[in-house]
């Protein structure tokens, strides 16, 4: 994503724009919303572009914010919904999705929780690779609508989507938890670490993490419990969109 944009405006006006420059900051947890709002659906379809290029997963079509979209250039305060983090295909999610598509045995026949699902690409990759049950989780109800639209783009029936903060709750058993680009804030990283450890110890849940090497991740104590499974060179457009980050990796969590 280029940042010589009119839409960028003063960065103080929209934390989303800071996200793109700093690598995805903390955003507020939100309450459950409807994924069936027709007005919202029409607005997202009008203001996003269907694309499968410029990422590690050309097999997956997604509705994203691109330079051909009005709000790439428009004033940020004119966007009527919560900050559209879901409208960017972040590099950690790209690596996770690529890994699942290339290694379908990891998810085939398994139950999967996609934590911080965003555009839903990793959940979609899991479904394409044969996962039996999927729950996509994101704190933003607008992401829920985006995930629903992206499922349909890829010929999939929408899977369950939970739009709330689940880090303070005890979740049911999943065979696999996947999360990408979630270690962007130190406090959140600590909460994630504890929550993921509890899932592993309580249920033996496998955890895969995608990250391009942000400082909050590479400098966190969780590194002592990770094993790298794969590393991918990011496509040039993704490198440009992420301040020159060149690779993204997938890690297996073993506390």
Swiss-Prot record:
Keyword annotations from UniProtKB, A to Z: Cytoplasm, Methyltransferase, Mitochondrion, Transferase, Transit peptide
The molecular function terms of the Gene Ontology recorded here are: heat shock protein binding; protein-lysine N-methyltransferase activity
Enzyme class name: transferase
GO CC entries? cytoplasm; mitochondrial matrix; protein-containing complex
Q: Does the keyword Methyltransferase apply?
A: yes
Return the EC number: 2.1.1.-
Q: Please list the residues that make up the transit peptide in this record.
A: 1-32
Q: Which Pfam family is one of those matched by this entry?
A: PrmA
Main location as per UniProt:
cytoplasm
Which SUPFAM superfamilies did the record assign?
S-adenosyl-L-methionine-dependent methyltransferases
A biological-process GO annotation:
methylation
Q: Which InterPro entries match?
A: Ribosomal_L11_MeTrfase_PrmA, SAM-dependent_MTases_sf
Belongs to which family?
Answer: Belongs to the methyltransferase superfamily. ETFBKMT family.
Quaternary organization: Interacts with HSPD1; this protein may possibly be a methylation substrate.
Protein name listed in UniProt: Electron transfer flavoprotein beta subunit lysine methyltransferase
Q: Which organism is it from?
A: Rattus norvegicus (Rat)
Instruction: Read off the lineage from the record.
Output: Eukaryota, Metazoa, Chordata, Craniata, Vertebrata
